[in-house]
Amino acid sequence: MANNTIKRRKESTEKYIDALLENNSKLCGVRVDLKYKQEFAKDVSLDTINKDLKRMLDNRRNNKTVFGNNLGYIIKKEVSDNGNPHLHALFLEDGNKVQKAAYKADQIGKYWSEDITKGKGCYENCNRREYKNNGIGMVDYTD
């Protein structure tokens, strides 16, 4: 990917998060990778993952248990070396109401795997792993 594209995406992401922090004193970054179980992954097209993602995002308004405190999201679609599409998702939650990012990531992941993909999906809760510079968890407007 060209350096200009990376720079533009970084600036756009920073602007987006800054805009959310203008109206919210805290954001809780919830990172979850959404994918498909190995036995189904080879049959999943980019069109399928796009439809599943759209359905999940469209359903946010009606699923207050999982998405009631969601303020926004950043999602990166990828296709792995073996051709399996998956999503790297960062859900930005109201940090005054959501403090347990790992718990929220499990809620989102289970919704993806059980309801959206009807048992064909799986997820990885990135909030339960240690990263050097993870960019997840609580962000205060003063940061």
Identify the role of each PLM range:
Residues E39-A41, N82-G83, K97-Q99:
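Eukaryotic short linear interaction motifs
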Residues M1-N24, G95-D143:
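Catalytic "initiation/cleavage/transfer" segments centered on a nucleophilic residue
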Residues G72-G95:
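Histidine-centered divalent-metal-coordination microenvironment in nucleic-acid enzymes
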Residues R31, L90, D143:
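Short aromatic/hydrophobic contact patches that present stacked aromatics
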Residues Y16-V79:
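Signature for HUH/AEP ssDNA processing cores
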